[in-house]
Structures are given as structure tokens and as C-alpha cells.
Amino acid sequence: MIPLLLAALLCVPAGALTCYGDSGQPVDWFVVYKLPALRGSGEAAQRGLQYKYLDESSGGWRDGRALINSPEGAVGRSLQPLYRSNTSQLAFLLYNDQPPQPSKAQDSSMRGHTKGVLLLDHDGGFWLVHSVPNFPPPASSAAYSWPHSACTYGQTLLCVSFPFAQFSKMGKQLTYTYPWVYNYQLEGIFAQEFPDLENVVKGHHVSQEPWNSSITLTSQAGAVFQSFAKFSKFGDDLYSGWLAAALGTNLQVQFWHKTVGILPSNCSDIWQVLNVNQIAFPGPAGPSFNSTEDHSKWCVSPKGPWTCVGDMNRNQGEEQRGGGTLCAQLPALWKAFQPLVKNYQPCNGMARKPSRAYKI
């Protein structure tokens, strides 16, 4: 255990703002899968506060060491710098199409269907990509909390630690996804170094083709991620209209099924995009649950090596909205996610047609 802990500490530069794992130590990346309510045993499970935890050295999914509403868990600990009294040396963007404190004057439905946090200092920081409505609370709240509205259903949160320079690329991606930024701090050197982020907080977006963008991001420890972002004028499903062909693989997609205009599994192209219907964690205790109980958004290639975690569903309305996903070919990530697919909607026998050529 001690060598593993030392290795984790050495992988992330000292002084950099990073994701913190369930162990309380810096990690390069982690995934938290908040379980639906009523799945599992005990009062916490009944209230929908339990989660599964994954990072590169966790050996697969583990039970969360805290509850999702605790500041001692991976998510709460990572976000703690937001809620300290002195944040003058930080920059942050909190964005959510369902913000914690919506105003009648706001119309976030015109923005991208996208949720996340950018938090950084002068050495680096992290990108938290998630599916959670009304989250996280603004910095002015001075305390981490989990919204009651996000307890019932499953949710995913992917945190990746990045060097300072990588945030300029993220700024470009957000001009495509067109997020609703409900809380931010971007001053001095941060505004100078990241003009795209400044444009994002001002409500600007891309104004000419192409209406989609993919970029390579390299984490603090050197892990390679691929960010995919589309603007509303892209006018197609993220997964069947772009991602499957760009990655060159079939995809099994988990998304929120309680929306209008759900797109069926798509087998009309070279690469199949299959809707996941049921999720099951390994082991006799599971748990297992249906996609109608799960608000998370992720996809996995059935035979590897790709896994993506993002913020978009497969429905007709979101073909006309911005959003994206963050993908990687990390063995630990794929080996954890691929077995979760217990059942999916099969193809309907539609004839295949030649695929458009996409490059990553």
C-alpha cells in the first residue's frame, strides 16, 4: 500500500491543484458513480447517497469511503478549495444547464446541455465533467453540499487533473458546448492566458463552421484524453452522428431515458450505437438498475479500448444543443465500465450505409 501511495503522490506535481481521491491523496483522475436511491442496504442507500469509486490504482470499482454529500469523499474534497475564505489565487468556472439557483430571467435551455467545473491555480487544476443537476453550490455558499434533487437517480462525475497550459484547450471546447456559467472567477493572469474562457463567461460561442471540435488533452501524470464538443448547429446526435465514427468503434451508450424523443439504437451506419437499458455492478450485491433510474451519461466500446464520460443524452432535442464528452483509452477505465452493461437495445436490422469520414 505504501509504494502505491508514494507512486500516486509522485505522479502529480507538488503544489498543483488536483483531483483528490477517496484516500484523501492527490490522484490524476477518478470517476464517482453515484448510485440510484433504494439500491443497496442501509439508510444511506435508501436516501441515494452511496457511490462507487474508481481511479487508476483502485483495482476496479470500490464502495465510496464516505457519502456523496460529505466533504470527506473524493468529490467533496476536490471541490473544497472553492469554499475556502481565500480564493484570490484561484480561477474557476461552474457551469450547468440546470444551475443551483436558477433565475426567472435566465433561459439556460438555450445553452448547451452540459455540466462541469474548471478549477485551477497558477500551477494547474482539474476539469470535473458530470451529469448532476443543481450542482455544485456557488463559491459564495462557503460549503460543499449535494442537492436533494440529485439523490434519487444515478449520476457520474469524472475528475481529471491537468497542467496549467491545458486549460486554453478546454476554453476552446467550451465555446462549442456553450455552457450556462452560473459562477466564475477569472481575473488577472487567468483572463490574459485564457481568452477563450473569458469569452465563455461573457456568453460567447463559435459563430462559423465547423460546428464540432475534438482536441487531445494530457493530464498531469501524462494520461491522454480526447475531448469532443459540439455546438447546437451541428444538428445531429453526438454518438451516432460523430463519436462512433471518430473513434472507429461500436458504442454502448448509457443516458437518461426519461426524456422526450429518445433516439433508438442506430445501426444504419458502419458503427453501431446501442442504447444501454440496464446497468449491473460486479459481485453478488451489485447493485443493478435500469437506465430509467440512472441520469448518468457515458459510453463504452464493447471490445475496447474507448470509454467516454460526458453530459449528453440521445434524444431529438439534444441534437440541436451543445454538449460533449471526455474519452480515453485507459485500460483501468474500460475494464471498469464495459462489464457494467447488462442489457442494451439491439439493432433493428436497418441497412448500413457508408460512413462519413471523421478524424480524431
Swiss-Prot record:
Effect annotated for changing C327A: Loss of activity
Tissue: Expressed in monocytes/macrophages (at protein level).
Chief location: other
Any one biological process term the GO annotation gives: regulation of immune response
The EC number(s) this enzyme carries: 3.1.22.1
Consequence when changing C19A: Loss of activity
Compartment(s) of residence: Lysosome
Cysteine pairings via disulfide bonds: C19-C159, C267-C347, C308-C327
Keywords, sorted A to Z: Apoptosis, Developmental protein, Disease variant, Disulfide bond, Endonuclease, Glycoprotein, Hydrolase, Lysosome, Nuclease, Signal
Cleaved signal peptide residues: 1-18
Effect of N212Q: Reduced N-glycosylation, complete loss of N-glycosylation
The record's account of how the chain is modified after translation: Glycosylated. Genetic variations that affect N-glycosylation sites reduce activity, but enzymatic deglycosylation has no effect.
Gene Ontology CC terms, in alphabetical order: extracellular exosome; lysosome
Catalytic activity: Endonucleolytic cleavage to nucleoside 3'-phosphates and 3'-phosphooligonucleotide end-products
Top-level taxon of origin: Eukaryota
Effect recorded for N266Q: Reduced N-glycosylation, complete loss of N-glycosylation
GO molecular function: deoxyribonuclease II activity; DNA binding
Transmembrane segments: none
Disease cited in the entry: Autoinflammatory-pancytopenia syndrome: An autosomal recessive disorder characterized by severe anemia and thrombocytopenia apparent from early infancy, hepatosplenomegaly, and recurrent fevers associated with a hyperinflammatory state. Additional systemic features may include chronic diarrhea, proteinuria with renal disease, liver fibrosis with elevated liver enzymes, deforming arthropathy, and vasculitic skin lesions. Some patients may have motor delay or learning difficulties associated with subcortical white matter lesions on brain imaging.
Protein's job: Hydrolyzes DNA under acidic conditions with a preference for double-stranded DNA. Plays a major role in the clearance of nucleic acids generated through apoptosis, hence preventing autoinflammation. Necessary for proper fetal development and for definitive erythropoiesis in fetal liver and bone marrow, where it degrades nuclear DNA expelled from erythroid precursor cells.
Protein name, UniProt field: Deoxyribonuclease-2-alpha
Taxonomic placement: Eukaryota, Metazoa, Chordata, Craniata, Vertebrata
Gene: DNASE2
